[in-house]
């Protein structure tokens, strides 16, 4: 039913959006998820399917793909409507208080409340810029679907953040050799990850950038890197590249939706309320003082946003859902 009105529509089907959908089911809210990508899972599905995630309480280690699969299964407990391949470009509050959401393809959705869980927005990876980069498309990787493609190869990872360091360490026991190229000196990563990296067999090249790819017949053989302090170049043998230079994020038309934005997202209060009544935000979409940007924190913010949406609809409703072990859906 195209004109069906939902209690809550969650924009974004990443980990936080999926868990928010599960929690909204605990609150007996009719729920829809709208995601711009072909499938739910967000950046975790796209960038980290084989990366080991360790910063969620009670889960010592899990791959990104398995985390997304578990969250999707959990989200589907209460049968939310899931719409993919639609990017929401406009949210308008109608005279009756219902929000009209318009997608890039012209589709219209109606909802009494909206929870924004789009992360940093839609994203596009920053591509490697170097001589002959177009000659070796199969050797350049921006995400990893299968670690086995790197087995017994000489691999170079380029980047200096958590993801680049994690991938270098993940590839170390699989690849024949791993190089890590970073244009800076101080890695922008967790202290323990940096310590482990420096104690590993990964060969680190700080203050270096990739300048040229060398090979024949579309087969990469080596790369030329340059020190940005001395301008001295050197060539290192490399069969595969993993590039982690961050992403270009696009909040799209959100700036026109009426709520307050800051440098790192949508401004919310401690109830995940935006400055527009009825619209809430959580996960990397939201920003507030002393925010922690890890999945575990977002999994906490999602239920807060849903509870606020529930109270917006029903001011006399309980402040929070009954814990799942006591919920009627899981008893008997």
Curated annotation (Swiss-Prot):
A Pfam family assignment: Pyr_redox_2
SUPFAM superfamilies named among the record's database cross-references: FAD/NAD(P)-binding domain
Class of this enzyme: oxidoreductase
InterPro entries cross-referenced by the UniProt entry: FAD/NAD-bd_sf, FAD/NAD-binding_dom, Fd--NADP_Rdtase_type_2, Ferredoxin-NADP_redctase_2
Key words, A-Z: FAD, Flavoprotein, NADP, Oxidoreductase
Enzyme Commission number, as recorded: 1.18.1.2
Catalytic activity: 2 reduced [2Fe-2S]-[ferredoxin] + NADP(+) + H(+) = 2 oxidized [2Fe-2S]-[ferredoxin] + NADPH
Free-text cofactor note: Binds 1 FAD per subunit.
Lineage: superkingdom: Bacteria
Chain segments annotated as coiled-coil in the UniProt record: none
Cofactor: FAD
Cross-referenced Gene3D superfamilies: FAD/NAD(P)-binding domain
An annotated Gene Ontology molecular function: ferredoxin-NADP+ reductase activity
Amino acids binding FAD: 35, 43, 48, 88, 123, 284, 325
PANTHER family: THIOREDOXIN REDUCTASE 1-RELATED-RELATED (PTHR48105)
Subunit structure: Homodimer.
Family recorded in the similarity comment: Belongs to the ferredoxin--NADP reductase type 2 family.
Protein known as: Ferredoxin--NADP reductase 1
Organism: Listeria innocua serovar 6a (strain ATCC BAA-680 / CLIP 11262)
């Amino acid at each position: 039913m195209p004109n069906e009105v939902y209690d809550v529509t969650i924009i974004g089907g990443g980990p936080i959006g999926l868990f928010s959908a599960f929690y909204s089911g605990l609150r007996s809210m009719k729920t829809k998820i709208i995601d711009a990508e072909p499938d739910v899972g967000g950046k975790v599905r796209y960038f980290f399917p084989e990366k080991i995630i360790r910063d969620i309480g009670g889960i010592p280690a899990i791959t990104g793909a398995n985390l997304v699969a578990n969250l999707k299964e959990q989200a589907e407990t209460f049968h939310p409507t899931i719409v993919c391949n639609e990017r929401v470009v406009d949210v308008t509050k109608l005279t009756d208080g219902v929000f009209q959401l318009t997608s890039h393809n012209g589709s219209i959705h109606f909802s009494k409340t909206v929870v924004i869980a789009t992360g940093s927005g839609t994203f596009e990876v920053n591509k490697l810029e170097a001589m002959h980069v177009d000659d070796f498309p199969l050797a350049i990787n921006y995400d990893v679907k299968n670690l086995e493609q790197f087995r017994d190869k000489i691999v170079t990872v380029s980047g200096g953040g958590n993801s680049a360091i994690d991938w270098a360490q993940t590839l170390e026991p699989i690849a024949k050799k791993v190089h890590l190229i970073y244009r800076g000196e101080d890695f922008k990563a967790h202290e323990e990850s940096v310590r482990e990296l420096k104690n590993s067999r990964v060969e680190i090249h700080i203050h270096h950038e990739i300048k040229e790819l060398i090979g024949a017949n579309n087969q990469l053989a080596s790369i030329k890197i340059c020190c940005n302090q001395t301008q001295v170049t050197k060539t290192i043998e490399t069969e595969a590249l993993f590039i982690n230079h961050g992403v270009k994020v696009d909040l799209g038309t959100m700036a026109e939706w009426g709520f307050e934005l800051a440098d790192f997202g949508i401004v919310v209060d401690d109830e995940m309320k935006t400055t527009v009544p009825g619209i809430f935000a959580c996960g990397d979409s939201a920003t507030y003082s002393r925010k922690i940007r890890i999945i575990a924190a977002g999994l906490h913010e999602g239920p807060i946003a849903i509870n606020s949406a529930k109270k917006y609809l029903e001011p006399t409703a309980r402040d929070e859902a009954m814990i799942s072990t006591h919920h009627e859906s899981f008893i008997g």
